[in-house]
A protein has these predicted regions:
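Glycine-rich phosphate/diphosphate-binding loop of Rossmann-like nucleotide-binding domains
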Residues: 16, 21-41, 93, 99, ...
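N-terminal ligand-binding/catalytic initiation module
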Residues: 1-95
């Protein structure tokens, strides 16, 4: 039934540990995700790997197949395209759209941080957090931790700490640079965590 059927959609550009491996090689990962839906939630899921990296083509394709699904799970789509793809599909479809690499990861990190802070007797506002990676997961982790009231977050990408004015950042990174790194630290990860 439509209400119990989810499309697991990927273009294979950001497969965990493998990177941009393309749609054919990504299929076993999507099949595995579909099995997890069935095993743990009794939700039927259908893996779909698209042979395009074009944002508009992905959005249009998902919109065209959406009427037969109860939800869309976006999977392993590289940043920064994944942000626009998810945002637009949420705006344009009347079914749930979820990008697992962003939100699933952020939820797990937030849960771990809540418990870690309990163990050390700190509040969210007192925490100083460094996030290594400013792609889809890192940006989403940062957004969720900001909603939880974390006091200071520094996002670090391969080119360094996100700080306003850096020309190399994409739009999502620029947004986070304005909301984080209150001391305007610069440099690579080893310099930030010292």
């Amino acid at each position: 039934a439509k209400g119990n059927l989810v499309a697991v959609v990927s273009d294979g550009t950001a497969v965990l540990g493998l990177g941009d491996i393309g749609p054919e090689a990504a299929m076993p990962v999507m099949e595995g995700k579909a099995l997890l839906f069935k095993e743990f939630a009794d939700i039927d899921a259908f893996p779909i790997c698209l042979d395009t990296k074009d944002t508009e083509e992905i959005i249009e394709t998902v919109k065209r197949i959406a009427p037969v699904f109860g939800g869309i799970n976006l999977e392993d789509i590289s940043a920064p395209r994944c942000f626009e793809i998810e945002r637009r599909l949420k705006e344009e479809l009347d079914i749930p759209v979820f990008h697992d690499d962003q939100h699933g990861t952020a939820i797990v990190v937030a849960a771990g941080l809540i418990n870690a802070l309990k163990c050390v007797g700190k509040k969210m506002e007192e925490a100083n957090i460094v996030i290594n990676g400013a792609g889809s997961a890192g940006i989403s982790i940062c957004r969720l931790l900001l909603q939880f009231g974390v006091g200071n977050i520094v996002l670090v990408d391969q080119k360094g700490a996100l700080c306003p004015g850096e020309a190399w950042m994409n739009d999502a990174q620029k947004e986070m640079a304005e909301k984080t790194n209150k001391d305007r630290q610069t440099g690579l990860l080893p310099e930030i965590i010292k």
